[in-house]
Amino acid sequence: MTRVFMPATRTFMNGPIHDKIKRAIQTAEGLYYRLVLLAGTTGTGKTGVLRDIAEEFGSTVININLAISSELLELTAKQRSLRLPDILDQVVSQFQSPVLLDNIEILFDKNLQQDPLRLLQGISRNRTIVASWNGAMHSGKLLYAEAGHPEYRSDDPGDTQIVEMDGTATVDR
């Protein structure tokens, strides 16, 4: 199993967004799915905030695109769809909670035929997961990408903890 991560290089977490994320992590630890999503469009600071969290918790940020794609290379298309949940679980099981995930776009690949939110919820049953989500909350729905995009999704987040990132990193649900 290849370990793919981004080293933490920023200062410790402080400020309103960091407090909200800490509260979301604490809340998630008592839920069935221990999942916190940092939802925001590209450029809203999700990666930087994940690096801050990594530094505070002495952890690393896992680049899911790199970790998963390297494991899927040798598999057929059918095997990729079937094995992806197990491969994702194996990748995150190498790390202590909270497990920090960035660059999760591969989970949305239509060829893999997966439900990305359900995948993340599944791996968050036994560990706290904090993941970036390239989208937003709108009318109670968790959106990924924009309407018309091939990977567009609109999901009911259930009790998943959502921290909305708006570019200034101060908005929260």
Regions found by a protein language model. Name each.
Residues T2-E29:
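N-terminal pre-Walker A segment at the start of P-loop NTPase domains
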Residues Y32-G48:
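Walker A/P-loop nucleotide-binding motif
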Residues R34-L37, P98-L100, T128-V130:
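Residue-level preference for the first positions of well-ordered beta-strands
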Residues V49, I53:
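Hydrophobic positions on the alpha1 helix immediately C-terminal to the Walker A/P-loop
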Residues A54-I62:
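Post-Walker A helix-loop "phosphate-sensing" segment adjacent to the P-loop in P-loop NTPases
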Residues I64-V92:
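Short glycine-rich substrate-engagement loop in P-loop NTPases that contacts/grips substrate
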Residues Q94-L112:
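Conserved P-loop NTPase "ATPase switch" module shared by AAA+ and STAND
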